[in-house]
């Protein structure tokens, strides 16, 4: 959100509604979540909906820019190979002709123009570059053994299932197992789980802390063990024509995905709409937004 809009929202004093628009469904925010909701409605043959987006273009942090030479992402820039549980993502990729053949196949074929081998990470430590995300120079045999055991256990957890038959750590997260034995991990910190399972190596705690800060914005001592393990064990998508750690991407990052979603909401996205009031009534929801300098009331 630009500072100008933020200050306008803070200052208040908006004019009374100049017009009222009615719709069956109103989606506030045209980021990936909002566009996904619109895509789902369109696929269900629901066409009476609107998307309100504050910026000049929908897409949130999946938008892209364009230089004279090449497009470039502003934020989100790759998609891991979708898991079997990610049926909606696979359906979208099939619509966009990036996933070829059966979208429910264990190892689908993907358009090679969107496939990218995972960039190999490296760490700058003590004035030297080291390959991989974990340091190995000057690490004793005991710490190296812990690193190997941790990676092996995460590979096991990628296939682990609960008593309900679901994967312990799935994407979408809501499809993960509800088995109490796995869910109990949500009640202890990730750092505590590591220590309790013999993972005391400083390099592993550094990696865990890096991971949780990157995805959740919190230290591994503030993140639940379930969430921390989900980071490492949720991705198990495969492809017939790529390694399992490959990703789907393009020069513009994830903008191609965003535009694929937005296409299904064509004509129903209201940009430059800053919502400043939401009121839930008995029969409907009333939303006031500034659009083109005037307040428009939306009723859904």
Give residue spans per PLM region.
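Short beta-strand segments that buttress and anchor functional surface loops
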Residues: 287-291
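Short, solvent-exposed loop/turn and secondary-structure capping segments
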Residues: 38-39, 61-64, 90, 133-135, ...
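Dinucleotide-binding Rossmann-like beta1-alpha1 core, especially the glycine-rich loop
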Residues: 70-157
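Glycine-rich Rossmann-fold phosphate-binding loop(s) that bind the pyrophosphate
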Residues: 29-32
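Glycine-rich FAD pyrophosphate-binding loop
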Residues: 42-68
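Extreme N-terminal leader/targeting segments of oxidoreductases
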Residues: 1-25, 43-48
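Active-site/ligand-binding neighborhood in enzyme catalytic cores
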Residues: 162-284
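Core beta-strand elements of the Rossmann-like FAD/NAD(P) dinucleotide-binding domain
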Residues: 21-23, 293-300
């Amino acid at each position: 959100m630009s500072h100008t809009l933020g200050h306008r929202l803070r200052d208040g004093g908006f004019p009374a509604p100049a017009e009222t628009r009615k719709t069956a469904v109103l989606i506030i925010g045209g980021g990936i979540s909002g566009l996904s909701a619109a895509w789902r409605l369109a696929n269900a043959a629901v066409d009476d909906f609107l998307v309100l987006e504050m910026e000049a273009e929908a897409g949130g942090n999946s938008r892209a820019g364009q230089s004279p030479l090449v497009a470039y992402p502003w934020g989100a820039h790759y998609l891991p190979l979708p898991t079997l549980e990610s049926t909606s993502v696979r359906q979208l990729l099939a619509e966009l002709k990036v996933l070829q053949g059966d979208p429910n196949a264990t190892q689908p074929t993907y358009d090679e123009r969107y496939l990218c081998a995972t960039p190999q990470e490296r760490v700058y430590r003590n004035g030297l570059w080291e390959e991989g995300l974990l340091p190995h120079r000057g690490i004793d045999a005991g710490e190296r053994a812990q690193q190997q055991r941790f990676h092996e256990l995460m590979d096991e957890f990628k296939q682990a299932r609960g008593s309900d038959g679901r994967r312990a750590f799935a994407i979408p997260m809501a499809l993960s197992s509800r088995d109490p034995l796995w869910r109990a991990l949500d009640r202890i910190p990730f750092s505590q789980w590591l220590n309790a399972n013999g993972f005391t190596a400083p390099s592993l705690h550094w990696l865990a802390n890096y991971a949780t800060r990157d995805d959740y914005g919190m230290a591994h001592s503030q993140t639940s063990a379930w969430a921390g393990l989900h980071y490492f064990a949720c991705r198990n998508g495969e492809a017939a024509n790529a390694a399992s750690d490959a990703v789907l991407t393009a020069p513009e990052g994830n903008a191609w995905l965003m535009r694929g979603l937005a296409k299904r909401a064509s004509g129903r996205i209201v940009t430059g709409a800053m919502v400043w009031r939401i009121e839930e009534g008995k029969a409907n929801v009333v939303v006031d937004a500034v659009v083109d300098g005037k307040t428009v009331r939306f009723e859904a």
